[in-house]
Amino acid sequence: MPISQKNQNFIDRTFSIIANILLRIIPTTSGEKEAFAYYINGMSAQSEGNYAEALQNYYQAMHLEMDPYDRSYILYNIGIIHTSNGEHSKALEYYCRAIERNPFLPQAFNNMAVICHYRGEQAIQQGDSEIAEAWFDQAAEYWKQARTLTPGNYIEAQNWLTITWRSK
C-alpha cells in the first residue's frame, strides 16, 4: 500500500475515533447523535467509493438532522457524489440546497462553477457558442462568490476569470 494511502487510512480511522468520542461527550439529543452517526458513516462509505451506501447514510442523516448548518454539509456531500457519478443536474440541485442553508460554503460555489464550466466546454464542442457563453458566465458568478468568501483561494479560477475578462 502506498504511503499516501496508509496516511489516508490512518486519518480516516483517527477521525472516526474522535467523532465517536465526541458523540458520547457532547450534550446532544439522541436524534442529533443518530444523525451525526449516519453522517460519519456516509463520509466513510464515500471515502471508500461506496456511493450507494454513502447516499443511504446521508439520506438517513437528512431525515434526522434539523440544524440547517449541519444539513448544508450533508447536502453538499450528496452533491459531491452526484458530481462523481456524472449526474450534474442533481449535483447542482444539492449544492444549491446546501447554499440555501449555509451561504458561506465556498466549496459548493466552486463545485457549481466547475460543473457550469464543464457544460460550457460541452456546448463549445457541440458548436453552440451562445449556450457556452451563458454557462461560462454562470461559472464566473459562482467562482466570484467562492473567491469573495475565501480570498486567496481558487487561484486557477481567478486566473480564468482574468483571462476571460470576467473578473469584474
Swiss-Prot record:
Top-level taxon: Eukaryota
Membrane topology annotation: Peripheral membrane protein
Keywords noted in UniProt: Membrane, Photosynthesis, Plastid, Repeat, TPR repeat
Primary location recorded for the protein, binned into one broad class: plastid
Places the protein is found: Plastid membrane
InterPro entries: PSI_Ycf3_assembly, TPR-like_helical_dom_sf, TPR_rpt, Ycf3/AcsC/BcsC/TPR_MFPF
UniProt cross-references to Pfam families, sorted A to Z: TPR_12 (PF13424)
GO cellular component: plastid membrane; thylakoid membrane
Family: Belongs to the Ycf3 family.
Listed HAMAP family: Ycf3
Function field: Essential for the assembly of the photosystem I (PSI) complex. May act as a chaperone-like factor to guide the assembly of the PSI subunits.
Name this protein carries in UniProt: Photosystem I assembly protein Ycf3
Organism whose genome encodes this protein: Cuscuta gronovii
Gene that encodes the chain: ycf3
